[in-house]
């Protein structure tokens, strides 16, 4: 399955992958067209951001070198884990992922199931969003993924049931961390970890 999923990503197709929270709908993050296909498949407005997902923080830092420094310290303190971190993107890289805020980028480095980790190690960073129709419940299993997304995917990677609670989204672009969405990690814990990384 890993070879099939790698081939699908390299061909510009979407794939359905397990993460540490829910099943994700992913595509090559380095190219605009495959990433935009994710918006079309799930009916998500392109004005709304999606994440750049990788197996390791170093992959994210290589993709967005401006994150080295304060943002990199914060990323290493919180990742890998069930977080989406919103970080500064001064060079406006990966604009197709950033919606109406290209000066910010959301990144994910999950605690991946081994089958997904093996895939990410081969393809680098992916554009990623949850494998549901826009506004629908997050999928904790492949049975929860809509048929139209399965039909539109070039490959599907099954890791069985997942926790089903989405990542906690933390905005780290300002002087103080802000929780934008409470998910798998309680807001108070997320803020405490972020402030601890800043020495506060």
Predicted region positions:
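Active-site-adjacent structural elements in enzyme catalytic cores
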Residues: 1-200
């Amino acid at each position: 399955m890993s070879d099939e999923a790698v081939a699908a990503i390299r061909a510009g197709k979407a794939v359905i992958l397990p993460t540490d929270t829910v099943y994700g709908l992913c595509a090559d993050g380095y190219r605009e067209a495959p990433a935009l296909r994710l918006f079309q498949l799930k009916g998500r407005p392109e004005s709304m951001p999606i994440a750049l997902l990788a197996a390791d923080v170093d992959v994210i830092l290589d993709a967005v070198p401006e994150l080295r420094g304060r943002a990199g310290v914060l990323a290493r303190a919180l990742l890998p884990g069930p977080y989406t971190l919103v970080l500064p993107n001064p060079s406006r890289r990966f604009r197709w992922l950033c919606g109406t805020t290209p000066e910010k980028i959301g990144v994910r480095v999950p605690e991946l199931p081994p089958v997904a980790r093996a895939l990410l190690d081969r393809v680098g960073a992916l554009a990623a969003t949850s494998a549901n129709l826009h506004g629908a419940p997050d999928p904790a299993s492949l049975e929860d993924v809509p048929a139209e997304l399965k039909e539109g995917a070039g490959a599907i990677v099954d890791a069985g049931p997942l926790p089903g609670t989405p990542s906690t989204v933390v905005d780290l672009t300002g002087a103080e961390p802000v929780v934008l969405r409470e998910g798998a990690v309680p807001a108070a814990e997320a803020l405490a970890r972020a402030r601890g990384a800043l020495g506060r």
